[in-house]
């Protein structure tokens, strides 16, 4: 159990059989009446965001989320299959669960998968990945590091904006949170 006074961003609670993550919280102490906590909660399973108010000191069941490191082994149809390298258990994620993160996922990559009651909730990719450029416009003599950017397609099919001097076959570091170019590898 967790008190509403102990809410922090990232705290996970269980409400009506669903797992919710606290996105924002604000402790309010009005001049008249009792204190309360105004929160913005995100459903970890569906991604829905709701605003909810709790009385100060109200206790709620905390959701125990287990984080396991798993390796992306292969893609079966549109499903992504991951394997725990210690127990050899497999977990499957749908394209909806993967979202935009699928475009940075390579076979053999290790990721963290979040479980609740043996159900797959979410996936956490590393903050950056090394990807190879498969298609981009050729660099022209005179292109500099301080110049503009151009679109490039990486081995996973994602489009990344890269500096003009980057060419096909080079390996670059990409931020998985926003898809930005971080540098050469």
Swiss-Prot record:
Q: Which SUPFAM superfamilies match?
A: Nucleic acid-binding proteins, Translation proteins SH3-like domain
One Pfam match: EFP
Q: Which residues form the signal peptide?
A: none
Write out the GO biological process terms. Answer: peptide biosynthetic process
- What is the similarity comment for this entry? Belongs to the elongation factor P family.
Matches recorded under PANTHER family: ELONGATION FACTOR P (PTHR30053), ELONGATION FACTOR P (EF-P) FAMILY PROTEIN (PTHR30053:SF12)
* The protein's name in its UniProt record: Elongation factor P
The species is Microcystis aeruginosa (strain NIES-843 / IAM M-2473)
């Amino acid at each position: 159990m967790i008190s509403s006074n102990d809410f922090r961003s990232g705290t996970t609670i269980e409400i009506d059989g669903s797992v919710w993550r606290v996105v924002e919280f604000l402790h309010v102490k009005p001049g008249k009446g009792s204190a309360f906590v105004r929160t913005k909660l995100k459903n970890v399973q569906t991604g829905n965001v709701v605003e909810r108010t709790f009385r100060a000191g109200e206790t709620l069941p905390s959701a125990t989320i287990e984080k396991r490191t798993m390796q992306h082994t292969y893609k079966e149809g549109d499903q992504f299959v991951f394997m725990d390298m210690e127990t050899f258990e497999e977990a499957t994620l749908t394209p909806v669960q993967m979202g935009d993160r699928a475009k940075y996922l390579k076979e053999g990559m290790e990721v963290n998968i979040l479980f609740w009651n043996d159900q797959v909730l979410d996936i956490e990719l590393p903050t950056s990945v090394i990807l190879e450029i498969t298609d981009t416009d050729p660099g022209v003599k005179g292109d500099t590091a301080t110049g503009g950017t151009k679109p490039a397609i990486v081995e996973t099919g994602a489009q990344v904006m890269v500096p003009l001097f980057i060419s096909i076959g080079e390996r670059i570091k990409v931020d998985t949170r926003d898809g930005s170019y971080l540098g050469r590898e």
